[in-house]
Design a protein with these regions (language model features):
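Beta-sheet ligand-binding and adhesion/scaffold domains
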Residues: 2-6, 28, 64-124
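Central antiparallel beta-sheet cores of small beta-barrel/beta-sandwich binding domains
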Residues: 10, 17-87
Length: 124
C-alpha cells in the first residue's frame, strides 16, 4: 500500500452515524488509527438499547472502485460475538461511508446467514 493510500485512508477516521435512524442493524461505527494499525468499533441496535460490539483490529485493503475511477482504501474487520461472526468491510464511496456486513450464525438457532449494506455520515 502506498503512502498516498494511507493518506486517503485518514478520511475513514472518526465516528460515523447511520443515515437510517430506524435501522435495526448498526447505528454507528468508529474508525481509529494508532501507528500503522487500524481499529473498528460498532454499536448495534437492541430491543433494550444500544449494543456495543468489541473493538477489533482492521486490515487495510485496496479499494479500486470502477465507478468514476475512484481509488481509495477499505478496511476489513471481523467481529466474533460467539453466537455469530460478522465480516465487515468499510469504505468511502463518493463521501458516503458504507458498511457491508456478512453475518454467519455459529449457534444452532437455525437463523439464516445474511448480507447487509448500510450507509453512514460523519458525526458533525
Amino acid at each position: 500500500m502506498t503512502q498516498a493510500d494511507v493518506h486517503n485512508a485518514d478520511e475513514l477516521l472518526g465516528r460515523w452515524l447511520n443515515t437510517n435512524h430506524e435501522t435495526r442493524g448498526i447505528s454507528e461505527c468508529t474508525v481509529a488509527r494508532d501507528g500503522d494499525g487500524w481499529s473498528v468499533s460498532l454499536v448495534g441496535v437492541g430491543e433494550d438499547g444500544p449494543i456495543r460490539w468489541p473493538t477489533v483490529r482492521a486490515t487495510p485493503l485496496a479499494n479500486v472502485e470502477e465507478e468514476a475511477g475512484q481509488k481509495t482504501m477499505a478496511l476489513l474487520a471481523t467481529f466474533d460475538l460467539g453466537f455469530m461472526r460478522a465480516e465487515t468491510h468499510v469504505r468511502l464511496n463518493k463521501g458516503v461511508f458504507v458498511i457491508v456486513l456478512f453475518v454467519t450464525f455459529l449457534d444452532d438457532s437455525g437463523r439464516a446467514n445474511y448480507l447487509n449494506r448500510e450507509f453512514f455520515y460523519r458525526q458533525p
